[in-house]
Amino acid sequence: MLEFPLINDTSRKIIHIDMDAFFAQVEMRDDPSLKDKPVIIGNDPRKTGGRGVVSTCNYEARKYGVHSAMSSKEAYERCPNAVFISGNYSHYREVGMQIREIFKCYTDLVEPMSIDEAYLDVTTNKLGIKSAVKVAKLIQYDIWQELHLTCSAGVSYNKFIAKLASDFQKPAGLTVVLPEEAQDFLEKLPIEKFHGVGKKSVERLHDMDIYTGADLLKISEITLIDRFGRFGFDLFRKARGISNSPVKPNRVRKSIGSERTYGKLLYSEDDIKAELTKNAKQVAESAQKAKKVGRIIVIKVRYSDFSTLTKRMTLDKSTQDFDTIDRISHSIFDQLEENSSGVRLLGVTLTGLEDQEGRQLDLDDLA
């Protein structure tokens, strides 16, 4: 078997900034009466006949087991005292741009992964600060002082570990993983904490008696490649803290969609839902093939009178998973006003895209 040298560039200084429960936090900032209350961004199921899905929620709501992509009905059952807010996504985008302007005060090497998180390469920065930890603290301070919002930061020598570190202490945390600490940090992590390892992959790894980073470290490269395909090559290196992917400031944002026009109009809900599922499947397959993930799902419906409706849902985390895209598409459709006209066109689109590599590849996608 052809072997590749394990080259680990530990000279860089990478920060990953992740806003804490961003949408909910913006709402709480703008409305002080929400302080200490469980806040859910999603339609109130009491007003929609039980329809709707959770986009995100604050940490108070998470104590009740509420999480993104959960049905609003289940979220209400778990936390009946929660405040449901439909969400003002244009406002969230405006705040997100304000955060990016703060990043640009320190470096132009900023790679936005979504509206509320980004990688920054501060190896060399505009203020000439040698300490990446100091830069991270200053960014957290600036975001709080200027926008009254908190974020968590991870600091390390590559994007993979910086991302893991930012999740380690939330909210408002700062975790630093130095090159000499990386191996110990990774070995102690449960395998499900490795970004991109989905539920099915966790089961498959558990079947191999892999429960932690330390367990993963024991598995040979050829075994991982044989079991997980080309991602095994990457996973072998990630277990050793090796990931030399650069911070890419000029990322091309596109959308992936599937639309179908029907010569014979669709009237029955079963037929419409079946066609939505076909579109969702096409979008998921295209996203996986293009190695893209997205966190905004849009559906488009055109009726027999050529009137057209579009509605979108922004998720807490990016996805390319068919089940998620399908479920959210159906939930969005259920929120549309009832229309007795026949359906002439249906479309599903995944947008707010990012590279699958940046999100950390899902083993399920590549095995």
From Swiss-Prot:
Its EC number is 2.7.7.7. It is an enzyme of class 2 (transferase). Its cofactor is Mg(2+). GO terms for cellular component: cytosol. The record marks F23 as: Substrate discrimination. Keywords: Cytoplasm, DNA damage, DNA repair, DNA replication, DNA-binding, DNA-directed DNA polymerase, Magnesium, Metal-binding, Mutator protein, Nucleotidyltransferase, Transferase. Mg(2+) binds at D18, D116. The active site is at E117. This is DNA polymerase IV. It comes from Streptococcus thermophilus (strain CNRZ 1066). The lineage of its organism: Bacteria, Bacillati, Bacillota, Bacilli, Lactobacillales. The gene is dinB.
